[in-house]
C-alpha cells in the first residue's frame, strides 16, 4: 500500500511568490519540458519541474529547505522553451528571495530591505551612525583643511574601523546562524527525497567538496552551459572579480596602515593602487552591463530586489571612483562629499548583505558544495 502524505498548502506563500516575480506559476501544467531542457539539472531528481509542482501547491517547507532552488542560475532556457509561457527561472528566483528572508534574522531588516517605500531609511541609518558616532568620538571633522586632500583627516580611519569591523562581525554572525539551519534543513530534505544516501555530514568531506567546487564558481562554468543568457557570465565575472580585488586591496592597506604605519593617500604608481583602480572600473562596467541586460530582457521579471542590488553595486563603484578623481582634481568639497556618500553605500552593501539578494553568493556556494558532497548522481558499481 502506498504511503500517505498530508498536503498542507500555504496560500500566503503562493501569494508572495506571485508578487515577487513568480506570477507565471499557474501557467505550468507539469509537462517537464523545463527539466528536460535545463543543461545544469541533475539526472537524479531533476529541477525545476518538481519545484513548479510544489510551488503551485504552496508547499513552502519542501521548497525553502531544498538546495535545488539554489542550483538554478536563472539562465532562461526553461522559460524560453516552455510551451505554456511559464517562467520556472523567475519562480525559482522568487523562492530563493523568500528563502533568504526565512534564514536571515532579525526579520525586521529583511522587511526593511524588501520594501521600496523604506529605501530612504537604508541611507538615513548609516548617515546618522556616521555623524553621531563621529561627533561623539571627535573622529569626524567637517573642516579638515590643509594643502592636501586627505580623506582620513575628514573621516578618520579609526572611525571607519570602529564602524565596519563590528559590522563585519554582525554579518558573519547572522550568516553563521542562518547557515547552521540551512545546512541542516537541506540535508534533511535531501535524505527524505532520495537525493543523497549519506546519513550525516562529515565536516572534512564538506570542506573538500567546497575546495572542489570553488574553481567552478570562479570560472562561472554553470553560466556558460546555458544557451539563452550565456553572455551574463561576463558581467557577473567582472563584478565578482572586482569585489575579490577590492577585498584584497582593503586588507593590504589595512596591514600597511596599522602594521607599518604608512598613511594614505597612496601613490598612483603603487601596484596595489593599480589593482584598486582596475577593480573599481570593472565594478562600474560590470554592473552597468547587468543593468543594461535587465532593461533589454523585457521577457524576464526584474523585481525591486534586483534593482536595489544593481543600483547599490553601481553606486558603490561610481562614488568610489568619483571620490578618487575629485581628489586628483583637487576639488576638496566634492571629494569629501563623495567619500561620505561612498561609505554610506559600503555600509548598505555589508550591513544588509544577509538580507539582500547578494546573500545568494553565500547560500548558492553552500548549496553547490552540498550537491557535490552528496554524490547525488554517483552511479552504483555494477555487481
Role assignments for model-derived ranges:
Residues 1-12, 41-70, 85-110:
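Non-heme iron-sulfur electron-transfer modules
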Residues 2-30:
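N-terminal signal-anchor module of multipass membrane proteins
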Residues 16-23, 65, 225-226, 331-333:
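Active-site-adjacent structural elements in folded domains
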Residues 22-42, 66-86, 95:
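Cysteine-centered iron-sulfur cluster-binding motifs in ferredoxin-type domains/subunits
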Residues 27-30, 64-67, 71-74, 277-280, ...:
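Secondary-structure capping and boundary motifs in well-ordered enzyme cores
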Residues 45-50, 54-74, 81-83, 89-90, ...:
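Membrane-anchoring/interfacial helices and their immediately flanking loops
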Residues 52, 69, 76-79, 92, ...:
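Short, well-ordered alpha-helical packing segments
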Residues 103-383:
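Membrane-embedded alpha-helical bundles of multi-pass integral membrane proteins
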Amino acid at each position: 500500500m502506498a504511503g500517505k502524505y498530508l498536503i498542507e498548502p500555504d496560500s500566503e506563500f503562493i501569494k508572495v511568490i506571485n508578487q515577487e516575480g513568480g506570477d507565471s506559476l499557474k501557467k505550468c501544467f507539469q509537462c517537464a519540458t523545463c527539466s528536460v531542457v535545463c543543461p545544469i539539472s541533475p539526472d537524479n531528481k531533476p529541477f525545476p519541474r518538481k519545484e513548479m509542482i510544489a510551488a503551485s501547491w504552496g508547499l513552502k517547507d519542501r521548497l525553502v529547505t531544498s538546495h535545488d532552488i539554489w542550483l538554478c542560475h536563472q539562465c532562461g532556457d526553461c522559460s524560453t522553451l516552455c510551451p505554456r509561457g511559464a517562467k520556472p527561472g523567475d519562480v525559482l528566483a522568487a523562492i530563493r528571495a523568500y528563502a533568504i528572508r526565512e534564514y536571515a534574522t532579525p526579520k525586521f531588516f529583511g522587511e526593511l530591505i524588501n520594501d521600496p517605500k523604506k529605501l530612504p531609511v537604508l541611507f538615513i541609518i548609516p548617515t546618522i551612525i556616521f555623524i553621531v558616532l563621529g561627533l561623539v568620538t571627535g573622529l569626524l571633522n567637517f573642516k579638515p583643511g590643509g594643502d592636501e586632500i586627505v580623506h582620513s583627516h575628514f573621516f578618520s580611519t579609526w572611525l571607519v574601523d570602529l564602524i565596519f569591523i563590528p559590522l563585519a562581525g554582525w554579518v558573519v554572525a547572522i550568516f553563521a546562524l542562518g547557515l547552521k539551519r540551512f545546512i541542516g534543513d537541506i540535508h534533511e530534505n535531501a535524505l527524505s527525497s532520495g537525493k543523497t544516501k549519506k546519513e550525516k555530514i562529515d565536516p572534512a568531506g564538506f570542506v573538500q567538496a567546497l575546495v572542489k567546487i570553488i574553481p567552478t564558481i570562479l570560472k562561472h562554468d554553470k553560466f556558460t552551459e546555458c544557451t539563452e543568457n550565456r553572455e551574463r557570465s561576463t558581467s557577473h565575472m567582472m563584478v565578482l572579480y572586482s569585489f575579490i580585488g577590492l577585498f584584497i586591496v582593503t586588507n593590504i592597506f589595512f596591514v600597511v596602515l596599522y602594521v607599518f604605519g604608512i598613511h594614505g593617500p597612496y601613490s598612483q604608481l603603487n601596484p596595489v593602487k593599480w589593482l584598486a583602480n582596475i577593480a573599481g572600473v570593472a565594478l562600474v562596467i560590470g554592473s552597468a552591463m547587468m543593468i543594461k541586460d535587465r532593461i533589454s530582457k523585457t521577457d524576464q521579471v526584474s523585481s525591486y530586489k534586483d534593482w536595489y542590488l544593481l543600483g547599490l553595486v553601481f553606486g558603490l563603484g561610481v562614488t568610489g571612483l568619483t571620490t578618487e578623481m575629485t581628489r586628483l582634481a583637487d576639488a576638496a568639497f566634492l571629494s569629501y562629499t563623495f567619500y561620505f556618500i561612498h561609505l554610506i553605500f559600503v555600509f548598505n552593501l555589508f550591513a544588509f548583505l544577509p538580507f539582500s539578494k547578494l546573500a545568494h553568493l553565500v547560500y548558492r556556494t553552500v548549496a553547490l558544495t552540498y550537491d557535490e558532497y552528496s554524490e547525488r548522481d554517483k552511479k552504483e558499481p555494477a555487481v
